Regions:
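Short alpha-helical elements
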Residues: 1-288
């Protein structure tokens, strides 16, 4: 058969990942300008074996698995019992260019968010009250916000109370999450009856805008969203490196909360114990 050269890359996977992550933290907006005029000129002592820009773009897709494992295993935060969930659109082109768009043809789809219709993908996030990302997943733009929660993709190591917007309203979803030890709180629609909740839960629900701040930092401080991608792999590499950059931020948006035991969960324990005692009494009474 035809022989292929298996020459190792000049740049290591770690060097490629570091360059991708540093791009989002340096305030740059054009990766080509950043790589050619900053990395290749001013950081030659840190990366002595730099390759051409075209070759570096080709190498990005080879570190996707390593970068994903690095984020999932090292950079994600820990659940504190109070979590916030939301999705944000990642547009790949303007709405006027949807019909002539070719880069993500067959991959991206139309979706609708609070800002209107868009064409692209969705980033689903779960964060804690410290602003740390607990988990994330990418879907096409037309996927319902509740689907990742129904499938359990986002809920690994999540427990306690979960706060979301009106897009997560659903009786079946609430019941399935409650069985798994997660209590879902959402704002009610105008035609719905108001639900009873404690003052602490109402305050946390008002603080749900915390995750909107995280989305804003991912898009404006980092550059997770732009329309200059030329392949799906490089789109994912850019998005993952933006998430990794955010995880390295020393100061994240956070809220100060004090845990208050409102006795909601103990109420279910008391009802269960009462039910068990009544069953025992009924069984002993019939046997006598």
């Amino acid at each position: 058969g035809k022989r292929h050269r298996r020459k190792p890359n000049r740049m290591s996977d770690a060097e490629i990942i570091v360059i991708l992550i540093h791009f989002h933290s340096g305030g740059f907006r054009c990766f080509k300008h950043y790589y050619l005029h900053y990395i290749c000129k001013h950081c030659k002592h840190l990366f002595p074996k730099t390759v051409s820009y075209n070759r570096f773009v080709e190498l990005e897709k080879e570190v996707l698995l390593q970068m994903t494992a690095f984020i999932k295993q090292v950079l994600l935060g820990e659940c504190t019992g109070i979590s916030f969930v939301d999705s944000t659109p990642l547009r790949v082109c303007r709405n006027q260019r949807i019909l002539i768009h070719r880069t993500f043809e067959g991959l991206a789809s139309r979706g609708k968010c609070s800002m209107g219709w868009f064409f692209g993908f969705k980033l689903h996030l779960i964060i804690n009250d410290k602003g740390e990302i607990l988990n994330f997943v990418f879907t096409t733009g037309g996927v319902d916000d509740r689907e990742p929660l129904k499938e359990g993709v986002l809920l690994k190591n999540i427990k306690g109370k979960l706060f979301g917007d009106k897009g997560y309203i659903g009786k079946t979803l609430f019941e399935s999450l409650f069985i798994d030890g997660i209590q879902l709180f959402t704002k009610v629609k105008n035609n719905m009856k108001n639900s009873l909740m404690s003052i602490a839960d109402k305050i946390c629900l008002r603080k749900r805008a915390l995750i909107e701040t995280v989305n804003d930092e991912l898009k404006n401080i980092a550059q997770i969203e732009h329309s200059r991608h030329r392949s799906f792999c490089n789109f994912i590499a850019n998005a993952l490196s933006a998430i990794a950059t955010y995880c390295f931020f020393e100061k994240k948006p956070a809220i100060d909360l004090e845990f208050i035991n409102d006795g909601q969960l103990s109420l279910f324990e008391k009802l269960y114990r009462t039910h068990v005692i009544l069953d025992i009494f009924y069984f002993s009474f019939n046997n006598s």
